[in-house]
């Protein structure tokens, strides 16, 4: 039996909106598998579609560079927001991004090796660990970039207007689509969601035949919600991104989005417990 930690229960609560006891029970039944627990809770009606995993916990910056026919995003992490604003840290991060765009196709391993000496020197000076975490390239006829406070970086590849593609990049930063078009959603993702929706419909007392018909409409909504062109445009929610792109004679072929610390869980200090520990030690 996997250990059901408080942090795991907390994550499930944040992602489903369900109560603590329901979340703990679901995790026990799923043997600690949070994704299975979410699926089971959705099937039983205890939770709606869960928020995508990826708690932003680490600090650092996202940098973007665009050259002819391609662009690159780089994530560099540190331990605190204070260091993320340090001039020395930012200088190194910008050096890394400049190297990445000047050496198209370089790997994260090559970047780490190239800047290891400077990184180690800065760690010794500042007294805080830091690392080059991710690098992603995007090719295209036109590449538009958008950075949101150095915490979120987006590159959008497409054809047409660079100005319009930048607006779409801002939308991607805000709405987090996973695919370009509804038809791009993988068969595995579609089938997984379809089975969940069928069970939800059947659990409401509907025969399987009727449940399957109900699911068709829900699946169309689902693929629209996770795809860029199917989402309501943040700058004009009365139309979809796809309709907006058609109106300005612009198209998107691909995009990438990085957010500082995605998937990294920061250790949360229990201040009261820490004070009690120190007090006991001084007694």
UniProtKB/Swiss-Prot annotation:
CDD domains: UBA_EF-Ts. The keyword Protein biosynthesis applies. Pfam families: EF_TS. GO terms for cellular component: cytoplasm. InterPro entries: EF-Ts_dimer_sf, Transl_elong_EFTs/EF1B, Transl_elong_EFTs/EF1B_dimer, Transl_elong_Ts_CS, UBA-like_sf. It is found in: Cytoplasm. Keywords: Cytoplasm, Elongation factor, Protein biosynthesis. GO terms for molecular function: translation elongation factor activity. It comes from the Bacteria. Its main location: cytoplasm. Residues 80-83 are annotated as: Involved in Mg(2+) ion dislocation from EF-Tu. HAMAP family: EF_Ts. Belongs to the EF-Ts family. Associates with the EF-Tu.GDP complex and induces the exchange of GDP to GTP. It remains bound to the aminoacyl-tRNA.EF-Tu.GTP complex up to the GTP hydrolysis stage on the ribosome. This is Elongation factor Ts. The lineage of its organism: Bacteria, Pseudomonadati, Pseudomonadota, Gammaproteobacteria, Pasteurellales.
């Amino acid at each position: 039996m996997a250990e059901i930690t408080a942090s795991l229960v907390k994550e499930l609560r944040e992602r489903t909106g369900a109560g603590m006891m329901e979340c703990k029970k679901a995790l026990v039944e799923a043997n600690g598998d949070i994704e299975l627990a979410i699926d089971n809770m959705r099937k039983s009606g205890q939770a709606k579609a869960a928020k995508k995993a990826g708690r932003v916990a680490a600090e650092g910056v996202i940098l973007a560079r665009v050259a002819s026919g391609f662009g690159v995003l780089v994530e560099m992490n540190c331990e605190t927001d204070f260091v993320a604003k340090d001039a020395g840290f930012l200088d190194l991060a910008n050096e890394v991004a400049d190297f990445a765009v000047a050496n198209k196709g370089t790997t994260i391993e090559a970047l780490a090796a190239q800047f290891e000496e400077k990184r180690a020197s800065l760690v010794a000076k500042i007294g805080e660990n830091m690392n080059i975490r991710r690098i992603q390239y995007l090719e295209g006829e036109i590449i538009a970039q958008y950075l949101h406070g150095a915490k979120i970086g987006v590159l959008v590849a497409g054809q047409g207007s660079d100005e319009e593609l930048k607006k779409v990049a801002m939308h991607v930063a805000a709405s987090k689509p996973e695919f370009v078009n509804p038809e791009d959603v993988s068969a595995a993702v579609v089938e997984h969601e379809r089975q969940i929706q069928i069970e939800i419909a059947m659990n409401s007392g509907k025969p399987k035949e009727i449940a399957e018909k109900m699911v068709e409409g829900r699946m169309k909504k689902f693929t629209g919600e996770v795809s860029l062109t199917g989402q309501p445009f943040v700058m004009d929610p009365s139309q979809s991104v796809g309709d907006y792109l058609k109106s300005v004679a612009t198209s998107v072929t691909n995009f990438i989005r990085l957010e500082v610390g995605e998937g990294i869980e920061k250790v949360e200090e229990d201040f009261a417990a820490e004070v009690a520990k120190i007090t006991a030690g001084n007694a």
